[in-house]
Amino acid sequence: PAKIKPRKDDHLMIAFADLYPSLLSLMGFRKEIPETVQTFDLSRHILGKSKKEVVQPYYYVQFDNHATGYRGLRTSTHTFAVHATNGKIDETVLYDRTKDPYQMYNIAGQSPRLVRQFNKQLKAWLLHTNDSFAHYLATVTK
């Protein structure tokens, strides 16, 4: 309790799964976090010792067909996602949440540089987590 300032307002994007490594680290057990853990240790962010942007992966998978569904990323400013049907990318969406907080206007077609950047980040994450969806991302063109 003495490490974390009370009544701290923060816009840190943290997923439920990130609690496991983050809490272990906060309790002094960083070295005991298994290498197989695929979520993030955000303890440095919680303690205010890191200003690095957190990028959270997003998944929507049909459990009977892993080649169909969404994968994406969310940053502090953007939401990016791609959809595949049977292993073929058929939709790419990109929203600027600072200008379009309700995510009504897909700007993927107007922002090819950002699409490539987020596509690269997403593919790296999917390869890291052994998600076969990573192999479909080579077909992203928008």
Task: Give a label for each model feature.
Residues A2-P6, L12, A17-Y20, L24-V93, ...:
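C-terminal cap/loop subdomain of S1 sulfatases and analogous C-terminal strand-loop tails that border
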Residues L19, G69, I107-K142:
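Long, internal low-complexity/basic segments
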Residues D100:
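Intrinsically disordered, low-complexity polar regions and short flexible loop motifs
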